[in-house]
């Protein structure tokens, strides 16, 4: 089984990934693949360089470029684990790449929605090198994500978590959903 986790930056995707990892299931981050590719190209890990490489990869290899680069990693992990989580899928082309590469696997899409103002505050607090520090940067990043096609992936989600309350409320939602998916794995569904 493959669980694709999607959502806008700062929505809470990583918390879902962490919950699966706590339970022994591995993950592949498409964002990490772009960051690795940025370094491979001899560029410093800056917000601008990562964004440029992300766009350049799609120009060179198609809209599903990052997914293509991830397929090998996912394949290796599926040999060792019955469930692999893929974090950061941003287009239906990427979903299609995974469906095509793994036709025998059940693929579940989990989307997280968090209101923009709340995401902005969380991203500012997170402090990762590529996180926006101004509302204008935040909006620009959101539009970039939407141009990649993330809205289509969110619309096609099998499960949607709304992350607009307390951390404790979201934790409960995440644990409940992860348990449901794992139960489905054990029964052949979800």
Curated annotation (Swiss-Prot):
Coiled coil: none annotated. Keywords: ATP-binding, Nucleotide-binding. SUPFAM superfamilies: P-loop containing nucleoside triphosphate hydrolases. The keyword Signal does not apply. ATP binds at residues 7-14. GO terms for molecular function: ATP binding. It holds the Pfam family AAA_17. Belongs to the UPF0200 family. This is UPF0200 protein TGAM_0868. It comes from Thermococcus gammatolerans (strain DSM 15229 / JCM 11827 / EJ3).
């Amino acid at each position: 089984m493959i669980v694709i986790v999607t959502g806008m930056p700062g929505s809470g995707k990583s918390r879902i990934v962490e919950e699966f990892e706590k339970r022994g299931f591995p993950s592949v981050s498409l964002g990490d693949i772009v960051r690795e590719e940025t370094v491979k190209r001899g560029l410093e890990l800056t917000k601008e360089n990562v964004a440029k490489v992300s766009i350049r990869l799609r120009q060179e290899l198609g809209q599903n470029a990052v997914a293509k680069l991830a397929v090998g990693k996912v394949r290796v992990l599926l040999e060792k684990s019955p469930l692999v989580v893929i974090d950061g899928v941003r287009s239906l082309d990427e979903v299609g790449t995974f469906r095509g590469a793994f036709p025998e696997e059940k693929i579940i899409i989990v989307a997280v929605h968090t209101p923009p103002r709340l995401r902005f505050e969380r991203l500012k607090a997170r402090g990762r090198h590529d996180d926006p520090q101004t509302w204008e940067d935040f909006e620009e990043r959101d539009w970039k994500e939407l141009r990649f096609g993330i809205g289509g992936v969110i619309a096609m989600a099998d499960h949607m978590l709304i992350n607009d309350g307390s951390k404790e409320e979201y934790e409960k939602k995440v644990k409940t959903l992860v348990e449901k998916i794992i139960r489905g794995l054990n029964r052949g569904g979800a």
